[in-house]
């Protein structure tokens, strides 16, 4: 019986993450910069740079070092992903509140904001500005991580942050860590196999540990032959189509389905939505459907407990259930020859997000013109505009409002709903009426302006002549 069976429930990247600062390998220079910065906070001396930006390749220890410092200095760590909290409102509400939080049972609070280079400056307008505002007033240290900190839109963050570079890990360091894990797990391993895994990781220790666990869990030992068979080169992430194929087409080994979901390019909740919508498209037998949905439901339960209870060791059960659990649920029928479908839930969420963004932009436009807050516009003005745009018998009225305030087509659609095309036509008609039936060419417009100026000048001269002929009797009235 393989010895790994008793410990395979916990991902080794979690089980063996550094508990102390000295456990983080090959990052001595980063430690020399970051540890004194944290000590200044703990001693009540707020540094000039209230945020730190850690940058370097994936899997080199950026997050691990912050976790180790928090553990060693007895700090409460609030970890957020910038990809999830990237809009202005999210950052002000979530990150802003965390920046003022006080810990009841520990020495202090540290905020870890992962993947700030994942913020989209076009889609998430205002996110960087909101983050800068939070950094200026924060009462707690803010640590951000990025793989590429030199993107143009991150320049304001670089200027206010302590920049800490993390070096790529060497082959020697990765092999040493893998060797220690094998010894702790009492796994038989070949040095050449560990070196092979380390080479394929391309300096990513986290990926190397995942590959080591995949080999050890599948066979109970780590040999060069097994490593070559299983580790096919570093795949940072597996695209969704390959992930679904590995799940629904029942791989030869359970670990293959598990690896497919654990290294998928999609996050856990999105991946569950993909699998959920495609189970009935691939499985036809009722008993197979029951087992697959049951496994996926249990995966959802464990994911919820991991996220909201903070017990991330349960993540291993999530991988087992939505990977091998769904794959081996098919015991009777064949895989149906139907195409994968895009999850309806994700499609609806994308549409709702677009509606929310349009609503925010509309509120911002109206707030500037009406000298009101955006909140007041949303609660007091938008309901009235909704009624006018959707209930007005004459589409000219809402069309004139839209033109007056410079509303875009999406904003009109938000307010008008099914009457969008009717009001857009009315807007075009009003525009033509304002400009005349034929839009003026530049030369014609110039000639018209000269004519209008000449008419105004002639009017002024006539007025002066009339005033000269007016005597005192005019003002005193007839005697």
From Swiss-Prot:
A Pfam family annotated for this UniProt entry: RCF1-5-like_lid
Cited InterPro entries: AAA+_ATPase, ATPase_AAA_core, P-loop_NTPase, Rep_factor-C_lsu, RFC_lid
Cysteine disulfide partners in this protein: none
UniProt keyword annotations, A-Z: ATP-binding, DNA replication, Nucleotide-binding
Segments for region (Disordered): 435-479
Statement: the UniProt record of this protein carries the keyword ATP-binding: yes
Single biological process term from Gene Ontology: DNA replication
Domain of life the protein comes from: Archaea
Residues annotated as binding ATP: 56-63
Compositionally biased spans, kind Basic and acidic residues: 435-461
GO MF term list: ATP binding; ATP hydrolysis activity; DNA clamp loader activity
Gene3D superfamilies cross-referenced by the UniProt entry: 1.10.8.60, P-loop containing nucleotide triphosphate hydrolases
Binding partners and assembly: Heteromultimer composed of small subunits (RfcS) and large subunits (RfcL).
Record-stated family: Belongs to the activator 1 small subunits family. RfcL subfamily.
Function: Part of the RFC clamp loader complex which loads the PCNA sliding clamp onto DNA.
Protein's name according to its UniProt entry: Replication factor C large subunit
Organism: Aeropyrum pernix (strain ATCC 700893 / DSM 11879 / JCM 9820 / NBRC 100138 / K1)
Lineage: Archaea, Thermoproteota, Thermoprotei, Desulfurococcales, Desulfurococcaceae
Gene name of the record: rfcL
